[in-house]
């Protein structure tokens, strides 16, 4: 084990670039992660598990190849970039190996460059069973989880009964704690079918295969920063799925805001450099919960089809609506974005008029901020600003100046309302379909 590095000097040590979802997820973070990872030495995950979903098309030996990332950092598409799964992530080991095997079969060699913190908690198959049982129990009030066991694993962690990666290397302790953990779930949900002893044996085998990937996560990330390595932190999910600041209870079970970066990796605020918020040019969400700007008719269906709005992880159809700047202003306050990446702007190409939410009104009074109470959110009257569309294909544009005037006006309005520069603009699904506004 390497010696513990000295604390990073905020003036001379490296700074991590952080990439965060600013809405309800599915904003297209993977594409910018792919673009930025070409300049990075480390791409790190800090929270969540294999409930995330990033799709990237990369060149592998001269062939355009599609990769779906769920648990692994998508920066692995850059052959010189190390992938790191931090302490705040919950790891389902079978999914880790299945995903690793899949991307390696597609020609992406990850030998010696994929690491997991020894403090990360483990997700087991019984967590996934419990996830489904809990959704059934909730009935019509179900949250609409991915049923990947993420919530139950974080529940085990919070109740201090969970198992961490390092426990795999004390077989007797692992077996004892595992049996106790499963028994607790039997008492809560009844005796569901589960091979406890078979699972213990399976994880004993996993432990040996996993061993080359295990590191002291705190030492790993601080060494990278102390050596001025370029670190990209790839956020999972998004601000409105955050356990504290999202549309609770229709959220995930981890901190998906900037705070989760610090606690999930064990780094101080002084180690953070740029914080890039990724936002769609419209709004989508998966699952249940209020959605003020949701479109149910023709335009909503148009956004769904043209934007291919189906979840990477679940395949579920995403709900679509107009861009909500009340949401985005709240998101900017919490995460402190230094710049924004506006994605899928081309999906709006055919629309004659485009609406943007600029305010919420309840009982004749404008709300001063995004409400915590979902009962209030469900009854807001949305105030819209209507802008003319550009009604032409922008997917081949490569510079800001090439965009139609009405398109630039749309971007400018968002930027001025939020007070944050839109530095990156996605105009198509390809990696190259990204305009960078430098300066």
Curated annotation (Swiss-Prot):
Pfam families: Adenylsucc_synt (PF00709). GO terms for biological process: 'de novo' AMP biosynthetic process; cellular response to cadmium ion; IMP metabolic process. CDD domains: AdSS (cd03108). GTP binds at residues 25-31, 53-55, 318, 344-346, 426-428. Binds 1 Mg(2+) ion per subunit. IMP binds at residues 26-29, 51-54, 146, 160, 237, 252, 316. Its main location: cytoplasm. It catalyses: IMP + L-aspartate + GTP = N(6)-(1,2-dicarboxyethyl)-AMP + GDP + phosphate + 2 H(+). The active site is at residues 26, 54. GO terms for cellular component: cytoplasm. Substrate binds at residues 312-318. Pathway: Purine metabolism; AMP biosynthesis via de novo pathway; AMP from IMP: step 1/2. It comes from the Eukaryota. Homodimer. Plays an important role in the de novo pathway and in the salvage pathway of purine nucleotide biosynthesis. Catalyzes the first committed step in the biosynthesis of AMP from IMP. This is Adenylosuccinate synthetase. It comes from Mycosarcoma maydis.
């Amino acid at each position: 084990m390497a010696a513990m590095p000295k604390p990073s000097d905020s003036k001379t040590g490296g700074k991590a670039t952080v990439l965060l979802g600013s809405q309800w997820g599915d904003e297209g973070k993977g594409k910018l992660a792919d673009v930025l990872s070409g300049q990075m030495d480390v791409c790190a995950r800090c929270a969540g598990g294999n409930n995330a979903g990033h799709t990237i098309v990369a060149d592998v030996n001269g062939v355009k190849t599609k990769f779906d990332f769920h648990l692994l950092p998508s920066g692995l598409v850059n052959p010189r970039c190390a992938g790191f799964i931090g302490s705040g992530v919950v790891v389902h080991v079978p999914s880790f190996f299945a995903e690793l095997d899949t991307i390696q079969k597609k020609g992406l060699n990850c030998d010696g460059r994929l690491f997991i913190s020894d403090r990360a908690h483990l997700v087991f198959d019984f967590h996934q069973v419990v996830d489904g049982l809990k959704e059934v129990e909730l009935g019509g009030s179900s949250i609409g989880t991915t049923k990947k066991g993420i919530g139950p694993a974080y529940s085990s962690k919070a109740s201090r009964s969970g198992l961490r990666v390092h426990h795999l290397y004390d077989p007797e302790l692992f077996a004892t704690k595992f049996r106790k953990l499963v028994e607790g779930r039997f008492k809560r949900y009844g005796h569901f079918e589960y091979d406890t002893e078979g699972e213990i044996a399976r994880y004993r085998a996993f432990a040996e295969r996993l061993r080359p990937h295990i590191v002291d996560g705190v030492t790993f990330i601080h060494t990278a920063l102390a050596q001025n390595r370029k670190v990209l932190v790839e956020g999972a999910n998004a601000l409105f799925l955050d356990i504290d600041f999202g549309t609770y209870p229709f959220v995930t079970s981890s901190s998906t805001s900037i705070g989760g970066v610090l606690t999930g990796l064990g780094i101080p605020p002084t180690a953070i450099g740029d914080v890039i918020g990724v936002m769609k040019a419209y709004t989508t969400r998966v699952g249940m919960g209020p959605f003020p700007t949701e479109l149910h008719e023709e335009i909503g269906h148009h956004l769904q089809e043209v934007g291919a709005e189906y979840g990477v992880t679940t395949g579920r159809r995403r709900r679509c609506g107009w861009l909500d700047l009340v949401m985005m202003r709240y998101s900017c306050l919490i995460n402190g974005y230094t710049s924004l990446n506006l994605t899928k702007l081309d999906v709006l190409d055919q629309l004659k008029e485009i609406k943007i939410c600029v305010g919420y009104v309840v009982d004749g009074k404008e709300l001063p901020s995004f409400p915590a109470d979902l009962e209030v959110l469900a009854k807001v009257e949305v105030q819209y600003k209507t802008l003319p569309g550009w009604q032409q294909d922008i997917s081949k544009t490569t510079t800001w100046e090439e965009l139609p005037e009405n398109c630039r006006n749309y971007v400018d309005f968002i930027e001025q309302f939020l007070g944050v520069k839109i530095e990156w603009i996605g105009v198509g699904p390809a990696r190259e379909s990204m305009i960078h506004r430098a300066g």
